[in-house]
Amino acid sequence: SAIACGESCVYIPCFIPGCSCRNRVCYLN
């Protein structure tokens, strides 16, 4: 299951390593 990284990526990319943008929210891969 996808684990949210606590970041949004609507206007800026994800900063936490290993996280990617999905549906405007950063998720851990």
Curated annotation (Swiss-Prot):
Superkingdom to which the source organism belongs: Eukaryota
SUPFAM superfamilies named in the record: Cyclotides (SSF57038)
Pfam families: Cyclotide
Residue location of crosslink Cyclopeptide (Ser-Asn): 1-29
PROSITE patterns, per the entry: CYCLOTIDE, CYCLOTIDE_BRACELET
UniProt KW Kinase keyword: no
Similarity section: Belongs to the cyclotide family. Bracelet subfamily.
Its biological purpose: Probably participates in a plant defense mechanism.
Protein name: Cycloviolacin-H2
